């Protein structure tokens, strides 16, 4: 569960290292986001010569959460940390590589480009 002010790691090579959630998209009263949800983030840490700079506002899709997510078959999945992949307005990833595993829930949300770039889908 991601909410405003949550710090997330970035799981791609866009150049950002840490981002902070500043808005959960999908309704004016929506408070929490989970795997596959799109959020608005502010870049808090970035490497030099990055595609995104520190202080920039971007969109991101959540690919891993510490909070467990229940699946239709009754199983749960959770990860060691909260991670996101930066995306543009067309919901395409900004980076060209994805680091670490991503959740299968992204496939149902039509993030096929992220699924294909990921080294492992859990």
UniProtKB/Swiss-Prot annotation:
Function according to Swiss-Prot or TrEMBL: Binds to 23S rRNA. Forms part of two intersubunit bridges in the 70S ribosome.
Single GO MF descriptor: large ribosomal subunit rRNA binding
Gene: rplN
Gene Ontology biological-process entries: translation
Entry GO terms, CC: cytosolic large ribosomal subunit
Family, as annotated: Belongs to the universal ribosomal protein uL14 family.
InterPro entries in alphabetical order: Ribosomal_uL14 (IPR000218), Ribosomal_uL14_bac-type (IPR005745), Ribosomal_uL14_CS (IPR019972), Ribosomal_uL14_sf (IPR036853)
Native source organism of the sequence: Anaeromyxobacter sp. (strain Fw109-5)
Gene3D superfamilies according to UniProt: Ribosomal protein L14
Protein keywords: Ribonucleoprotein, Ribosomal protein, RNA-binding, rRNA-binding
Record-given protein name: Large ribosomal subunit protein uL14
Protein origin, superkingdom: Bacteria
